[in-house]
């Protein structure tokens, strides 16, 4: 039974298709050959001959200049090193996400402190925090109470975060987004 081809293609197939090696390098009269001994300008045939003698591959490093730059290296090792570098770069990336903290106008002090502690944890990880205060029913009559709570939240976290803009009263909600300041993400 024959295996169906993956409709998205092989993920590892085309990563190195843009790199020209050995006989794939064409339409070039002379190249700058970089090797362990140094670099010099030689013809393409001479570079291919040297690559065969050294049992290495001729890999085009830069082809966008007047003189193409090629290296004498083992292409398998070169591919491995490139994959290793991309994996390391991917590991070091930190995607900033927006975490939301929902509070109410009649929040108890203990609950307020817990919500604040959660927001602080998110900020220390390098994430943004969106604080949303939602009014229900007649609570809208005393919207200044809600604004005071959100302002207190912002004030308590001012050492760790700065608001993108001042709290916005939008219908039945008050929203403020806070960015972490000065701290590197942990983990």
Curated annotation (Swiss-Prot):
Protein localization: Cytoplasm
A Gene Ontology term for the protein's cellular component: membrane
Domain of life: Bacteria
GO MF annotation list: ribosome binding; translation initiation factor activity
Pfam families, per database record: IF3_C (PF00707), IF3_N (PF05198)
Family to which this protein belongs: Belongs to the IF-3 family.
Name of this protein: Translation initiation factor IF-3
Taxonomic classification: Bacteria, Pseudomonadati, Spirochaetota, Spirochaetia, Leptospirales
């Amino acid at each position: 039974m024959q295996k169906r081809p993956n409709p998205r293609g092989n993920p590892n197939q085309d990563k190195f298709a843009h790199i020209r090696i050995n006989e794939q390098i064409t339409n070039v009269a002379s190249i700058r050959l970089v090797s362990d001994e140094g670099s010099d300008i030689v013809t393409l045939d001479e570079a291919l001959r040297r690559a065969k003698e050294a049992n290495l591959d001729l890999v085009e490093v830069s082809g966008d200049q007047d003189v193409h730059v090629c290296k004498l290296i083992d292409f398998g090792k070169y591919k491995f090193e490139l994959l290793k570098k991309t994996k390391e770069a991917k590991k070091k990336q930190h995607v900033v996400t927006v975490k939301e903290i929902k509070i109410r106008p009649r929040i108890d002090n203990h609950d307020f402190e817990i919500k604040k502690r959660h927001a602080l944890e998110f900020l220390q990880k390098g994430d943004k925090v969106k604080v949303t205060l939602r009014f229900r029913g007649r609570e809208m009559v005393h919207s200044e109470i809600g604004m005071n709570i959100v302002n207190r939240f912002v004030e308590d976290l001012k050492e760790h975060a700065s608001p993108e803009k001042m709290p916005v009263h939008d219908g039945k909600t008050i929203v403020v987004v806070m960015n972490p300041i000065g701290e590197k993400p942990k983990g």
